[in-house]
Amino acid sequence: MAPRAPDDAEHARRRKFLRDFHTFDSNIRFPAPYTQFAGKPLSQAAEQNWRYDALGYRNDSHPEARPASETLRVFVVGDSTLVDGQVFADTIPGRLETGLKQRHGAGARVYNFGATSACLNQMIALITTRLMDLQPDVIFVLGGATDIFQPWSFDPRAGYPYNHFAQESLCDYFFNTAKKDEDAEDLSYDSLQALIFGRLDNLRALTNWQSDIWEWEVVRQFELALKRLGRLSGGIGAPVRFLLQPAIVRKSERIGDEQNAASGEFLAYLDRQYTRIEQVLGRLEADGLAQGPFTVRDLSRIFEADTRALFTDIVHVTSEGRQVMADRLADEVAEMLVLSAEG
């Protein structure tokens, strides 16, 4: 038997492992039923003074059966762009709630269902397995960017949760009962890291990663997901509106640090894919697939002419940017309530 490594050496290996896989932090991407992951329920966000709610989302309390005091209930589903903010009131959903209370009274409530790195399929699963039973008046789905950029950096399979390849590797590493002793890897951080990166390399080869065909498959899977959401919306019990989120590639003039948000190669890819997604939204509307309980809006250019430095990376924005988004969502709520009343 090999001598056991000293504790300090083992700790060094763990630190290296966690450093290499910091984007899989279980505190912000904790396993969740149906949706792959959300925040770790009731845990405090790192270096922040707020906690996730009992479901792993950024609310002061998670929604339950709707009380009579809630005269308006709005759900905002999305990714980490909804998590940004010093306190709930500083997030996009929190700022939206403030605006809706001014328009509709104290009974207006907005709930934040932003999960860091969530893609559209995960958002659909959340709506159909949890949210549709909670009597919302309006559901917003703010997304698009994660479906585009995460296959570039993480799991290359279009429409998959970004860390699925790592989950597959972990499951096979620990729970594959068919492996014989001579086939099993030594239980170590080094072997696990090699297994995960090896699977990623294999998947990239199998999917023709970063090829033209692969780019179009990313768009195709996103379009299929949107169409599924459209078909499901009739049974959700509340109008659903998909909003294509803003991206730095749609800003005409990038100010200060905005100019260094990402590499030129990646920004060119993001620009191509956003153009294609915009065309997808146009086709849905032209084909009559975005009407009634399911509608779509393109908010990607909401900051196009803004001369302020608003983006902190390719999709996250400053507090000023979050306020612009919240104001726009308040207008969207007003429009959806009118359409719902007419319908």
Describe the predicted segments one by one:
Residues 4, 145-282, 305-308:
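Serine-dependent acyl-ester chemistry module
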Residues 91, 104-132:
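A conserved hydrophobic secondary-structure block that centers on an alpha-helix together
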Residues 80-86, 112-113, 212-219, 267, ...:
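Second-shell loop/turn segments in exported
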Residues 1-99, 103, 343:
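Membrane/wall-proximal cationic-aromatic binding patches
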Residues 131, 135-140:
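Proline-aspartate-enriched helix->loop->beta-strand connector
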Residues 73-77, 111, 139:
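Conserved beta-strand elements of the Class I
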Residues 222, 310-343:
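Histidine-centered active-site loop/cap adjacent to the catalytic His
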Residues 76, 141, 242-244:
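Structural beta-sheet core signal
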